[in-house]
A protein has these predicted regions:
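Hot-dog-fold acyl-thioester-processing enzymes
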Residues: 41-63
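Residues located in well-ordered beta-strands
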Residues: 23, 85-87, 99-101, 127, ...
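Catalytic strand-loop segment that frames the active site of acyl-thioester-processing enzymes
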Residues: 19-49
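Short structured motifs
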Residues: 18-24, 82-88, 109-111
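Hydrophobic beta-strand-centered segment that forms part of the acyl-chain substrate-binding groove
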Residues: 65-104
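Short connector loops at helix/strand junctions that flank enzyme active sites
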Residues: 19, 29, 57, 79-83, ...
């Protein structure tokens, strides 16, 4: 998924993410980076970024990476966040980049889901850092992946 396709996807499926200022910074098989800049539309009363905007950027860094692996697999999967936790270590101001580098773990979970037919869960970590490289937040998302039957087949 390139930036143009990402923007089209966000505008049509999750427009609040675009309104909040989420941007795809980098995506390859190994990882994904999402960027969001603190501003009037995503602020909280404490002069920093609203925590849910941070969570949205963090979730996108894991979900877009999973989506890439699903598309490249040629198979169909259902994917769902089944758990989430977060810690916040510093006020989020300026530009924050959320990074997930667990593409290999996603690929392994998808492969196992396809081979066994059983849903697989994988916990993915997304770390948000500010412009100085300091960590502002850490999110953990547990994703469940279930292989679906190929189109045109029935059970």
């Amino acid at each position: 998924m390139n930036r143009l396709l990402f923007n089209l996807f966000v505008w049509t499926k999750v427009p609040i993410a675009k309104i909040a200022g989420l941007r795809l910074r980098h995506l390859d098989d190994a990882g994904c980076q999402m960027q969001v800049t603190h501003g009037w539309l995503n602020q909280n009363p404490f002069k920093s970024m609203f925590w849910a905007v941070e969570g949205m950027a963090a979730e996108f860094s894991t979900g877009i990476l999973a989506h890439r692996h699903i598309r490249r697999s040629g198979s169909r999967y259902a994917m769902l966040v089944v758990a989430m936790s977060a810690t916040f270590s510093k006020k989020a101001v300026g530009t924050i980049v959320f990074r997930c580098d667990q593409g290999a773990a996603i690929a392994a979970a998808l492969r196992l889901a396809r081979e066994t037919g059983a849903p697989q869960q994988v916990e993915l970590r997304s770390v948000g850092t500010d412009e100085s490289g300091e960590q502002v937040a850490e999110f953990f998302f547990t994703w469940s992946f279930k292989a679906r039957m190929p189109l045109g087949t029935s059970q």
